[in-house]
């Protein structure tokens, strides 16, 4: 685990901390399929990553998942649990998660084949959302360009 002050912007391995921005480091800590959680903050949304990465000391990486759960299924489930994590975080100045909070999660244990069906569907939807955000960004850039040139 790394301290955020040691992060680099031009390394080759993703470095996850509690920010939305992914930083990079020249060395990795884990080579896993994992669900990554910020250990403190005001919101607790997971990230999914499969490969080599580094991790801030105040982040959790959930990996080597039990065989009755697909990691992506667990990731999608965890995306629905922000309010649970906010309610169960501890601390008076900065809300923090503890390992016990994860252990108490009540995860629906459905057949692995059904999990895979859900994953396929949700992955398709997520891909479409990302693609649409890219298109929207291009439209916004085009609009700014037109507005800046129309009223010169």
Language model features: what each stretch is:
Residues 1-109:
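DNA target-recognition domains and sequence-specific DNA-contacting regions of bacterial/archaeal
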Residues 106-152:
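Amphipathic alpha-helical coiled-coil/heptad-repeat segments
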């Amino acid at each position: 685990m790394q301290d955020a002050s040691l992060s680099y912007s031009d390394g080759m391995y993703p470095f996850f901390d509690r920010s939305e921005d992914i930083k990079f480091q020249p060395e990795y800590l884990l080579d896993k399929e994992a669900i990554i959680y910020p250990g403190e903050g005001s919101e607790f949304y997971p990230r999914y990553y499969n490969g080599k990465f580094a991790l801030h000391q105040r982040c959790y990486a959930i990996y080597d998942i039990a065989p009755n759960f697909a990691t992506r299924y667990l990731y999608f489930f965890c995306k629905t649990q922000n309010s649970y994590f906010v309610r169960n975080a501890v601390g008076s100045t900065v809300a923090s998660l503890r390992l016990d909070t994860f252990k108490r999660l009540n995860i629906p244990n459905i057949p692995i084949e059904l999990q895979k069906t859900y994953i396929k569907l949700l992955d398709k939807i997520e891909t479409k959302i990302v693609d649409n955000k890219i298109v929207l960004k291009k439209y916004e850039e085009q609009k700014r360009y037109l507005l800046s040139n129309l009223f010169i």
